[in-house]
Amino acid sequence: MLYGILAAASALLLTAVLSAAVRLPALRLGIVERRRGRRVPVLGGVAVMAGVGAVAWVGEWSGVAPLGQEAGRLIVAGAGLGLLGLVGDVWRLPAVLAAAGVVAAAALVVPYHELGVLGGVCGIAWIALVVHGFKGMTRSDGALGVVGAVTAFALSGCAAAEVMDGLATLFSVLAAALTGFLMHNWPPARVVLGTCGALFVGFVLAGGVLHVYAVGYGAGVGAPFALTAVATVDAVLVLVSRKRAGRELWRGGPDHLAHRLRRIGLTPPGVVVVLGMLAAGSAGVGLAIHMLWTEPGTAWWVAGAAGAVVLGMLFVPVGPPRGARAGAGSGTGVVPAADGAVARRARATGARDGPTGVHRVPGAAARRSIPGGRAPGPSPRPSHLGRQEAAELGRRGWVG
């Protein structure tokens, strides 16, 4: 008990420190992605993976909390997937290769002895689906951190009930590490998990659910589904919507659950809160089913709610969130730096193009002078404060 508290606290603090430490190297090396016009480092997954691995290794090395065979395979396979994702964060990684890596790693950790060959194959497919759902949450600040922490916390309770101490410790450490990471990932995020963290967290959680289910399968398949309902909903929503639209299933786009919640008017923190509440509700049902506090049929309510969410979100158009300015090339309401430079030069000089009586406005058609009337005068010169603000926005790479 005491070691569990110390391990969770250590993982939280260590991951928080590492998440702050990886920002500067990622910015200098250009391992970033643009979110709403900001350059955000994508090495948060390295911090989470290092924090969880360090605490787990200390417990195994000291003999105070040995992980056991199941937890050891999970963390090693998850770390391998995380390294594969890190390659994708630094260089472009084909989606097919990432999917093949998930399938290969799942094939190494599935408990065939308890599930059988057919059950093991179904487990591999289910792990791939859930990992895909968790991976999609990285596109929204804070979403994967909150949903992953809630799921890991509930899963640690399930593992403790089955006296799987190694897995229970691993999941509690992962929940604490994600909580520490959220200190830097809450909207607007200062660092994100990237593909590395998404594959590591998603795989450890999905594989852990399968291991716990293999031991306590008397509760039925409702508990594993409820524990990962939010990730499953996101994966199914994306696959169905892309299939209906005739798009490639593995090509990314703004069609995940978090994107659609933004489209209906939620703010970025609001999206995180809603997803966290959904994850807490569904994971709580899964924990209750596994602990035999409620009937296994309760999972049908979760399945019905999940189906309603998928059907409802299919009618939400895919695109930039409401309130984003039209004409933004990236769909985020941010004017590209090149267009902003042209507009700033035009405002700063108040230049005229063409003969007298014609004043050309950048990006708009020229206005003809009225015969016998006065020609439009030049645009007023911006104030000194306006020029300073435009220069600062241009230095950051965006306008507006």
Segments the model singles out, each with a brief description of its role:
Residues G216-F225, L292-V302:
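Structural signal for the N-terminal portions of transmembrane helices
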Residues C158-A161, D165, V215, S241-R244, ...:
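Juxtamembrane transmembrane-helix termini
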Residues M1-A235, G286, H384-W398:
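"…together with the soluble PPM/PP2C metallo-phosphatase catalytic core" -> "…together
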Residues P321-G400:
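Long, low-complexity, intrinsically disordered cytosolic termini of multi-pass membrane proteins
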Residues G297-M313:
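Small-residue-rich transmembrane alpha-helices that serve as helix-helix interface/gating elements
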Residues A21-R23, G312-A328:
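Membrane-interface capping segments at transmembrane-helix boundaries
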Residues V17-V42, L237-P269, G329:
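Cytosolic, membrane-interface loops and tails of multi-pass inner-membrane proteins
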Residues R263-V285, H290:
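Alpha-helical transmembrane segments of integral membrane proteins
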